[in-house]
Amino acid sequence: MKKDDIRRTVRARKSLLTENEKAEAAQSVFDRLEQMAAFMMADRILMYHSLPDELSTRDFLGKWSGRKHFFLPRVNGVNLDILPYEQTRLHLGAFEIEEPDGNDLTDIADIELIIVPAVAYDRHGNRVGRGKGYYDRMLAGSRATKVGVGYDFQLIDDAIDTDSHDVPVDIVITQSHTVIRRR
């Protein structure tokens, strides 16, 4: 399936969600994540700070930030820097996403688990992002377990057309499904 078609379809589905449906979905997805060995064993986790149309990460970050070391990406040109998450040290950055302040950069090799946002995922772990390639460039240098999270309708049955630079996730979690990619 073509990425632009997927983006249009998913955007339309997201626009129909109520705030209550969004909150229930986020709770369900992150409850599932908390039960996974990859999460339980990880201490250094790269998260994302959600956009309004994405599965919200705010409550999850608040719940676990005292027990796990979280990091957030910050746009730097065409790449993403990784910085420690401190709720009081965020500013509105590129694409109107809250990003960490400071210069305390972390190497991707030091991250044990990466929670990856996307527009959609297929059952092979392939993902459709927003089209800029930020996450693909960053994920290419990582050996960490990569977990994609989203709404049920973001997990599609059709195979996603991929390019040579696309980096799949290892696990996809939605409200009703957990898909583990075979390597």
Predicted stretch roles:
Residues 131:
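Short polar/charged helix/loop
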Residues 32, 127-128:
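Short linear sequence motifs
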Residues 39, 48, 95, 121, ...:
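Aromatic side chains
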Residues 1-109:
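N-terminal active-site beta-alpha-beta segment that forms phosphate/nucleotide-binding
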Residues 1, 5, 12-15, 101, ...:
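Surface-exposed, charge/polar-rich loops and edge strands
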Residues 48, 117, 175:
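Conserved residues at the C-terminal ends of beta-strands
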Residues 50-53, 119-123:
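Short glycine-rich anion-binding loops that position phosphate/pyrophosphate groups of nucleotides
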